[in-house]
């Protein structure tokens, strides 16, 4: 299972929308809920979390420099095409490594 974290300013409404977008993207590629889990966090909380992948904007990515995870930045967190292009290769690489 690949753990992802959608990071936004407050970790509330916009984070939930981003989480749902990530879930739709991964489901569109045929992945099920046993392949991934998406959490939501504000930037302060995110630094103490341990997902495999953070998805956020470049503004918040600067605060995640020292984490031990992939940090994927997107310009528009609500654009599912952009999310898809940004995360799918890294997601599949991590998932395949975990299945070995």
Question: How should these model regions be labeled?
Answer:
Residues 2-100:
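Short polar/charged helix/loop
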């Amino acid at each position: 299972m690949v753990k992802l974290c959608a990071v936004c300013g407050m970790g509330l409404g916009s984070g939930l929308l981003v989480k749902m977008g990530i879930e739709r993207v991964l489901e569109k590629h045929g992945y099920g809920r046993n392949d991934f889990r998406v959490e939501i966090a504000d930037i302060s909380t995110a630094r103490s979390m341990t997902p495999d992948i953070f998805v956020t904007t470049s503004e918040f990515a600067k605060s995640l420099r020292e984490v031990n995870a992939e940090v994927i930045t997107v310009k528009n967190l609500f654009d599912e095409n952009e999310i898809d292009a940004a995360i799918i290769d890294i997601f599949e690489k991590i998932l395949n490594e975990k299945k070995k």
